[in-house]
């Protein structure tokens, strides 16, 4: 059900525990990490069991407010990062500039890999970014998404689930709060944003310039996307990075039109959408090869999906 490269029950018995603690982590933080991992597994397992038995019925909490009268929204995103130090500051700054309140960044780097702390130090001090340690673990994207939602659903009106190469683009250039604070979303429990995919744009090697400047020409084919889900929903189970919530009835597109139960992953793309996600999936050939080698929170290193894309 839940595949982890490191079994939590065996974690304390690792021979290199002292090396790991000595490198960056003291005993208190190490214990805190174990607590996070145990909580992550429990939340995911409980929701998974409910969904498997057909007993899961997501519903808005009794604390629900009248969203048509709400004037200010609190919005956050949950993201997982691995070997993203070249891009993380641009990602964080972008979302800060469009008015996001918080980024929950799950550090999924290798145990002795790079750290986000120095690069994001100012954002961490300002509490715009909170880093959660899940270093060294694999196949944890979906458990993390469920954990992040359950831990924060009562703090935010909307929570997005995005990778670090996904940038929500609002055509009107209005802030993300103004965008969501619109009556078109009053009945929406989830807002699904289509990807607009950007490939290498005929660039081969990495350049020290922003992604938004380097890659400006989207591909002609677009499918898939990511979602923002309304907070305060009880018993919400997230089964994949694209489908946010089993039995959620009111999934909307960027215009507030309800698109569920249609196959919204493939059929919801709008040529005249008012907002979408710029997905810088491959970047340059050099960067994509690096992506294949590193793996991520969902796919292991050298996963066949990566190689198929590279060969095509």
Question: Could you say what each language-model-derived stretch is?
Answer:
Residues 102-107, 129-131:
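Short hydrophobic alpha-helical runs that function as membrane-insertion/retention elements
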Residues 48-71:
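Conserved oxyanion/phosphate-binding beta-strand-loop segments in alpha/beta enzyme cores
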Residues 79-93, 109:
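Active-site beta-to-alpha loop of glycosyltransferases that engages the nucleotide-sugar donor
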Residues 2-55, 142-143, 170-312:
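Catalytic-site signature of metal-activated, phosphate-bearing donor transferases
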Residues 112-161, 169-170:
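Active-site-proximal specificity loops/subdomain of glycosyltransferases
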